């Protein structure tokens, strides 16, 4: 398939790489085997100290489409921005170096974008484990009934609430460039896809979602905590950038109603992101993180950027308890991070009462 007559490739595939020799062959094998042949594969080596650069060079020798940006370590956001500056395909795709794509992934994503004139297309993916035995589980972000048709993604908060998964999508490069959509280049940071994803969903005129699973998202190392002090507040930095972008940049080009809507959406999804980040933290950082979370949401509520009623009942009760007294919440919720569904239900009963638990259970059943 080739849709670009300008001499540039149909798609630029960006692969950020740092010390991932164990998985890199499988990743690059899936990239060069794509049924969409008219692509460039840009490997951004972020100062790897293992054999990753040598593996990239192996593929460069075998396939002229493979290129490398070889640079000192500067973090994920800066690596991605360097790749975006080098890319010259009509579309941009992203592949994490420990994941791998289905052979027809890029062809399906680009074809859907072309048919619908979409600024981006996004698909489902598989959670993948290689040990103790190989298994996969579909991460169904999109139900079949919602797929294959153009949508305006900023119409509903549900779209913003999806897992960012920037790598199960392709984006029109001119859309990203025209809107100056880039990654937050904080050195050593984690969770650097939140602000990128928010801007994409807020600014896209048209998107298309696909039910197909296009990628295997490796889970073998998912159990690791955030143990580095300089990574504790990375998610806060992402949402600070989202807030800055809305109140400064969007205020110049959007109506006051749209700005208010985006602020509300940002705070609703921020709650989910913060709780997910909290669960992954080393426990010694819980108190510090909760104090900042409470301060931020208290400020947002006082500024009328959103209301607690914008959240589902169990989330509303939980956030109110954190905002009211984060240290009391921590003292009474020591097992929250590791709790299963029953443990969470008991927690929500304590902070919100039986009605909140009923809503939580019904939501779980509906899923």
Over which residues does each language-model region extend?
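N-proximal low-complexity "stem/linker" segments adjacent to membrane-targeting elements
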Residues: 1-32
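Membrane-interface aromatic/basic loop that binds lipid-linked glycans or pyrophosphate carriers
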Residues: 3, 118, 279-367
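Short aromatic/hydrophobic "clamp" motif used to bind/position activated sugar donors
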Residues: 92
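Donor-binding/catalytic cores of nucleotide-activated saccharide
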Residues: 76, 80, 97-211, 215-233
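Short alpha-helix within the catalytic core of nucleotide-sugar-dependent glycosyltransferases
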Residues: 25-29, 53-57, 89, 102-114
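A conserved acidic beta->alpha catalytic loop
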Residues: 45-54, 74
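Catalytic core of nucleotide-sugar-dependent glycosyltransferases
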Residues: 212-221, 227-254, 271-303
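Cell-envelope/extracellular polymer assembly enzymes that use nucleotide-activated donors
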Residues: 9-12, 40, 195
């Amino acid at each position: 398939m080739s849709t670009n007559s300008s001499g540039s490739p149909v798609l630029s595939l960006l692969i950020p790489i740092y010390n991932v020799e164990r998985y890199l062959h499988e990743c690059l094998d899936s990239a060069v085997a794509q049924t969409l042949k008219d692509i460039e594969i840009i490997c951004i080596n972020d100062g790897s100290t293992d054999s990753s650069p040598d593996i990239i060079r192996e593929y460069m020798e075998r396939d002229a489409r493979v290129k490398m940006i070889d640079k000192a370590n500067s973090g994920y956001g800066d690596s991605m921005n360097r790749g975006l500056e080098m890319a010259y395909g009509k579309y941009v795709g992203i592949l994490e170096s420990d994941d791998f794509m289905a052979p027809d992934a890029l062809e399906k994503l680009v074809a859907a974008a072309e048919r619908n004139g979409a600024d981006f297309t996004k698909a489902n993916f598989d959670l993948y484990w290689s040990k103790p035995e190989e298994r996969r589980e579909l991460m169904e972000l999109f139900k079949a009934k919602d797929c294959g048709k153009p949508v305006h993604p900023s119409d509903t908060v549900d779209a913003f609430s999806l897992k960012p998964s920037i790598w199960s999508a392709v984006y029109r490069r001119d859309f990203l460039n025209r809107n100056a959509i880039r990654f937050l280049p904080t050195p050593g940071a984690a969770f650097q896809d939140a602000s990128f994803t928010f801007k994409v969903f807020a600014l896209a005129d048209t998107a298309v979602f696909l039910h197909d699973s296009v990628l295997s998202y490796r889970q073998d190392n998912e159990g690791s905590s955030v143990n580095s002090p300089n990574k504790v507040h990375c998610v806060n930095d992402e949402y600070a950038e989202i807030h800055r972008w809305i109140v400064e940049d969007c205020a110049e080009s959007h109506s006051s109603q749209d700005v208010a809507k985006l602020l509300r959406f940002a705070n609703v999804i921020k709650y989910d992101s913060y709780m997910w980040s909290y669960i992954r933290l080393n426990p010694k950082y819980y108190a510090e993180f909760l104090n900042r979370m409470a301060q931020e949401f208290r400020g947002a509520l006082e500024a009328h950027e959103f209301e607690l009623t914008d959240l589902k009942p169990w989330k509303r009760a939980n956030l109110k308890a954190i905002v009211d007294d984060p240290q009391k919440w921590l003292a009474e919720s020591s097992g929250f991070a590791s709790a299963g569904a029953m443990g969470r239900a008991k927690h929500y009963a304590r902070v919100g009462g039986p009605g909140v638990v009923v809503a939580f259970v019904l939501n779980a059943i509906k899923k």
